[in-house]
Amino acid sequence: MNQRTTLYPLHAQLGAKLIPFAGYDMPVRYTGDKQEHMVVREGVGVFDVSHMGEFIIRGPKALALIQQISSNDASKLYPGKAQYGCMPNFEGGIVDDMIVYHIRHDQYMIVANAANIQKDWDWISASNEGIGAEMIDISDKTSLIAVAGPKADATLQKLAPEG
């Protein structure tokens, strides 16, 4: 049996077509591909991405580890901001893509692909051996949504204004 995200009951109640993906029962559509595509292109859409991996990297060595595993310069990443990039390997190939969030001073969160959670964790752990940052896998304890579309920012500002 596949795992289910925290939002699974809501997906089922709203009539989502659910399919197996990366060990989870995930919604693939509610009404129709074209209609849902246009809603996101012209308005705002919400996606359950709770099946993704989430790793906390923290402590005084956190930035050093992020710099070691990321194709981007995370020293330019301000708290509250994120970078999309990849984890390059030592041969110049790519281990996986990822999103790095700078949560606050000395704390970052990496979002990894659902199908590669263990592989990515192992790569980051091996890269951390000479660095010593604190690493915590919160994948099984975290729900995650993605909000996309040209009206996403305005919609989120209504829900969580700054200050």
Each PLM stretch: what is its role?
Residues 1-163:
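Basic, glycine/lysine-rich polyanion-binding surfaces/domains
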